[in-house]
């Protein structure tokens, strides 16, 4: 019900913007739509990859290979960063949160859920906040890693490869700082012994654990490769990535003979596709982005403020704005006019949401994914860590960005 309310609000907002100034509303819509089309394609690719067991198998392999909780945490942190960069932070949060719960397993004292509720040391207490915080931090590398990236750089026509070359060092710096803060503030959990038993979950993750380390290398893997290639090579990859996602889902639904790849494990259900895409939310957010983008074109205040700030000040202003109005409206508002330091703006927009739940919808997705596994993810604990990690990560990211200039 709430998703339909958001959808209606977004459509109404876009309608008001169109009535007030059709030219600016059209410009705002043209800036916003590629981001939402691309994320829809990436969510579809991520869904097929999850159905193929790729994420669950990666988590199971890490659990088997890592000798202790700290090494497991480092491996999961790297996995979260890479999936966020390649398949978008929303995909990472949706499909890796169950993997983090499963990989956390049971401590020698209690099961994961009991350990989290009773405050007992458990590696899951570090993996769960890491999932949301590192998903945000890991969304700096490619234009498609975060909706805000595409909104800000849409008119720049910069290729994914060029964007990645400029943002690689900031991505590494923010990721290392964020992971380090989570590890330090969760050090008791990372000292806990593991018993080698994964937490059993319902649905796809549980089934993947039945044959850990043996993912179905078919349509999902092909889709990931094609989506990554499009984002790296094309200046405007949105429609191509959407086509890849639709083709991947159709291949799983109707068979993959036409593509020359195998699609074992059954077809993707239409209801599951609708659940993952959540079109009312995507349409609503695009409408709101259009409305706020129109406001940014009519009101010169945000542009004038950013014009007087250095890169660090720009990043800080962006981070604060994500807490106040959410990162997507903030991206539309602050980039409606030319920005002096667009990449610094992105660091604030991507890392700032770690400060508070209002920063991005990924927080809501993280909470719902963890609770669907029957686990309370510990929101207050994650926020306490995020309040420390976000400022330090922003500072590290801007410093690394200035080194690449």
Task: Set out the residue ranges of the language-model regions.
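Long, contiguous bundles of hydrophobic transmembrane helices that form the permeation core
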Residues: 176-264
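Juxtamembrane and boundary regions of transmembrane helices in multi-pass small-molecule transporters
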Residues: 161-211, 222, 362-405
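Hydrophobic alpha-helical transmembrane segments
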Residues: 8, 36-37, 70-78, 92, ...
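Hydrophobic core segments of alpha-helical transmembrane domains in multi-pass membrane transport
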Residues: 8-20, 40-46, 80-81, 135-138, ...
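Alpha-helical transmembrane segments
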Residues: 31-43, 163-180, 342-357
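Transmembrane helical segments that form the transport core of multi-pass membrane transport proteins
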Residues: 30, 47, 51-52, 56-59, ...
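Membrane-interfacial helix-loop connectors
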Residues: 80, 84-90, 94-134, 147-166, ...
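Interfacial loop-to-helix junctions that mark the boundaries of transmembrane helices
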Residues: 1-3, 24-35, 160-170, 210-214, ...
